[in-house]
């Protein structure tokens, strides 16, 4: 699934970061399957007790399944879980210029833009959804 979104949404260099993330034990990570039992979307979150925030992490949809509502459902589910578990915590995420508008639909606001952060042509958009 990661590869279907590279290089438009992720840089090739991020694959190892994603793999390392998946072996962590202190995260919540969800996977959506379609009717053929194929993984079509995934994403997680993790609580940062130092600053009382929750990071929305590594959300992605297999590129062959974009525009089918999987990303929306996964994001709604994660935000709902976070607001139930951590009702007084802001939700943070970072994404690119290719997906920040998607997250704006859920109430996330841009706090910072860093040009070419992930790779040449892949800018980082830091976003927050405040409680």
Residue ranges with predicted function:
Residues 31, 38-47, 53-60:
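Conserved beta-strand in the GNAT
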Residues 75, 81-96:
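Conserved GNAT acetyl-CoA-binding A-motif
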Residues 92-94, 104, 109-126:
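Conserved catalytic-core motifs of GNAT/GCN5-like acyltransferases
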Residues 8-35, 44:
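Active-site rim helix/loop that mediates acceptor-substrate recognition in acyltransferases
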Residues 74, 99-102:
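Conserved short alpha-helix immediately C-terminal to the canonical SAM/SAH-binding motif I
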Residues 61, 67-80:
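Conserved acetyl-CoA-binding loop-helix of GNAT-fold acetyltransferases
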Residues 27-32, 42, 58, 92, ...:
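Short hydrophobic/aromatic beta-strand element in the GNAT-like acyltransferase core
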Residues 1-5:
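A short, well-structured alpha-helix characteristic of acyl/acetyltransferase catalytic modules
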């Amino acid at each position: 699934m990661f590869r279907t979104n590279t290089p438009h949404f992720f840089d090739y260099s991020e694959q190892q970061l994603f793999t390392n993330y998946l072996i962590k034990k202190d995260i919540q990570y969800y996977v959506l399957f379609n009717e053929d039992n194929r993984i079509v979307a995934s994403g997680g979150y993790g609580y940062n007790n130092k600053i009382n925030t929750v990071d929305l992490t590594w959300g992605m949809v297999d590129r062959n399944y974009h525009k089918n509502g999987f990303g929306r459902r996964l994001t709604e589910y994660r935000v709902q879980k976070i607001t139930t578990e951590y009702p007084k915590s802001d939700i943070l995420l970072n994404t690119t210029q290719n997906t920040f508008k998607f997250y704006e639909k859920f109430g996330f606001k841009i706090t910072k833009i860093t040009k070419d952060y992930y790779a040449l042509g892949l800018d980082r958009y830091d976003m927050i959804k405040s409680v």
